[in-house]
């Protein structure tokens, strides 16, 4: 009974490793494809202005209005 339980645990661990490595490899492959794809070599600096980490006074006022 103990041997069966140990074999079951090992099988679960190995299957989990296989599925997780498959997900990681597919994510890496899609990243490589996007780098060398048609749009992958474009200049992506235009997206740097989309995120502004600082909150201005007007932003804080707007958030206060939303929370009322």
From Swiss-Prot:
It comes from the Eukaryota. Its main location: secreted. Residues 40-68 form a propeptide. Keywords: Amidation, Antibiotic, Antimicrobial, Cleavage on pair of basic residues, Cytolysis, Hemolysis, Membrane, Secreted, Signal, Target cell membrane, Target membrane, Transmembrane. One of its GO terms (biological process) is defense response to bacterium. GO terms for cellular component: extracellular region; membrane; other organism cell membrane. The keyword Membrane applies. The modification Phenylalanine amide is found at residue 36. The non-amidated UyCT3 does not show antimicrobial activity. Expressed by the venom gland. Coiled coil: none annotated. It is found in: Secreted; Target cell membrane. Residues 1-23 form the signal peptide. Belongs to the non-disulfide-bridged peptide (NDBP) superfamily. Short antimicrobial peptide (group 4) family. Antimicrobial peptide that inhibits the growth of Gram-positive (S.aureus, MIC=10 uM) and Gram-negative bacteria (E.coli, MIC=15 uM and P.aeruginosa, MIC=6 uM). It also shows 35% of hemolysis when 15 uM are tested (95% at 50 uM). This is Antimicrobial peptide UyCT3. It comes from Urodacus yaschenkoi (Inland robust scorpion).
